């Protein structure tokens, strides 16, 4: 059944990391080297990656997401007492060539069959997104891949979401924005998108401005919400 607010959607725009792409896949694939620190490294790396993006935005000290990702990994490895340059290089390479969640390709294929415009809007740098889309095997399923580098500031700043309306020439209320990050979904909703939170981790809702249109636990539920 089509969800209220999603009947007149012209485009579906996805966050990348955590939504289409599994940001823990790099640490999982290095479990042999990391041992019992693999999960802690993956989670702390992601947390610092986001925190550094927000702090750099507040400080007016922008650096692209590849640099931020490396700095976050350096902090994480130091925090966990890991000194291994080869392992650091391996983790960064795996993050660059990240794995997609199993439901990512399925939902993009469904949207393609329905002739819906699809896009990514991500903190990732253009180089990172090009590599991720290729490694995930979804190159032919996306009409647009948008990086915050064109806004020179990170989500959830309004100018990032404006990239979508500017490039796609679609009003905000006709865009379905999908993110697994509750704060990102809130930012998108506050901007005016029809925001769908893919709550993969079964987390409580963020106490932030912006009213979500829907909450799902898997991307597989999205086509149904759109009436496809």
Predicted feature locations:
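Short, acidic loop-to-helix structural element flanking the phosphoryl-transfer center
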Residues: 62, 66-67, 84-120, 130, ...
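A metal-dependent, Asp-based hydrolase signature
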Residues: 39, 53-89
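Generic structural signal for small/hydrophobic residues in well-ordered secondary structure
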Residues: 15-18, 73, 120, 188
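Short helix-capping segments at alpha-helix termini
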Residues: 34-38, 79-86, 113, 137-141, ...
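An amphipathic alpha-helix signature
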Residues: 27, 42, 46, 66, ...
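Asp-based, Mg2+/Mn2+-dependent phosphohydrolase catalytic module
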Residues: 1-9, 109, 116, 121, ...
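Active-site neighborhood of HAD-like aspartate-dependent phosphohydrolases
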Residues: 2-50
């Amino acid at each position: 059944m089509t969800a209220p607010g999603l009947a007149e959607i012209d485009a579906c725009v996805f966050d990348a990391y955590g939504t289409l792409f599994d940001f823990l896949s790099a640490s999982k694939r290095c479990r042999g080297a990391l041992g019992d620190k693999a999960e802690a490294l993956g989670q702390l790396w992601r947390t610092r990656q986001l925190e550094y993006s927000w702090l750099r935005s507040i400080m007016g000290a922008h650096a692209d997401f590849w640099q931020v990702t490396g700095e976050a990994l350096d902090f994480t490895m130091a925090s966990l007492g890991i000194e291994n340059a080869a392992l650091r290089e391996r983790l960064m390479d795996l993050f660059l060539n990240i794995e997609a969640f199993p439901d990512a390709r399925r939902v993009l294929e469904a949207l393609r069959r329905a002739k819906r415009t699809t896009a990514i809007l991500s903190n990732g740098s253009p180089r990172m997104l090009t590599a991720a889309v290729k490694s995930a095997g979804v190159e032919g399923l996306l009409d647009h891949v948008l990086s915050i580098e064109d806004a020179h500031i990170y989500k959830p700043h309004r100018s990032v979401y404006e990239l979508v309306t500017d490039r796609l020439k679609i009003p905000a209320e006709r865009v379905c924005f999908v993110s697994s990050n509750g704060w990102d979904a809130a930012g998108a909703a506050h901007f005016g998108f029809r925001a769908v939170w893919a709550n993969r981790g079964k987390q409580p809702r963020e106490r932030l401005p912006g009213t979500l249109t829907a909450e799902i636990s898997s991307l597989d539920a999205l086509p149904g919400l759109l009436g496809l």
